[in-house]
Amino acid sequence: MGAIMLLSGCCCRDCCRHNACCREEKTVKRSEPITMTMKKKSAKEIIKEAYGKVAETGSSCAVIGGGCCGGGCALSADVGYTREEIDTLADANLGLGCGHPVSLADIKPGNTVLDLGSGAGFDAFLAARKVGEKGKVIGVDMTPAMLAKARENAKKYKFDNVEFRQGDIEKLPVEDNSVDIIMSNCVINLAPDKAKVFKEAHRVLKSGGKMAVSDVVLLKKLTKEQKDDPKLLCACVSGAILKDDYIDMLKKAGFEVTVVDEDKTINKKWFGDEKLPISSLKFTARKK
């Protein structure tokens, strides 16, 4: 799970003809965008409803509306996924990420990997290929429709070393000291209490275990109007916090943080000419 795009435009049909976003029958009209205000529903309720619609339709157009919203394949290729990864797991790729955390994780055969906000299973399945038969991948997501889609995809792609659990990343349904690697792709920004997420991550990681994360952070504070916009919440913007605050939270939770890369052009890629002070941060964080 990750960013619901506000983009509109053509699908990448030539590179991803099987992707759900590229199926004409899945295109959702602009008559269905989010209309609720932040005051009427909690952030978690808004996110759950929005991503439930994405899971059911296979497109972020279910929430934002407009064309094909960029195409999952094109967006995924732009943040680092290979053509082979995209083509072989097309139904699991909803184009909701802001990076490629699996490539940061250095996953080994036999590892236990936890995916925070696992969505339709794309990153979880890529990790499952690396952990092999002796390893295990656990995906946690709070949206029932996403979990159903992920489990359906696990059967379709024949992954028996992946388990999807319903839960909140602020209160993980995972045992203490049981995970080698935690990965997450454009999800932690959606959590209202990020400090809790990092404390929970520290709890479930084994000694020396690490996080490998791509996430949206702010380069400067948003306006009140931007903070209160539910569409920007679901698009991984209004729930984001300042980069320095994000890193400080990780350190306070007991992690040694290494910033691997940062994409300050993500705003233009996602929103075109709309100027939003966001960056896609790629980092690892090792449990001390």
Where are the predicted features?
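Conserved SAM/SAH-binding beta-strand->alpha-helix loop
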Residues: T143-A145
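A short acidic, Gly/Pro-enriched loop at the edge of an enzyme's catalytic core
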Residues: P109, E170-I181
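Short, glycine-/aromatic-enriched active-site segment of Class I SAM-dependent methyltransferases
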Residues: L218-V237
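Short alpha-helix
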Residues: S238-G254, T258-V260
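Hydrophobic beta-strand segment of the Class I
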Residues: V113, I182-M183
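A short glycine-rich, Lys/Arg-flanked "PGG" loop and its adjoining helix->strand segment in the class I
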Residues: A195-K210
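Conserved alpha-helix/loop element of class I SAM-dependent methyltransferases that forms part
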Residues: G71-T112, F122-L126, K130
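Conserved SAM-binding strand-loop segment of SAM-dependent methyltransferases
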Residues: Y157-E170
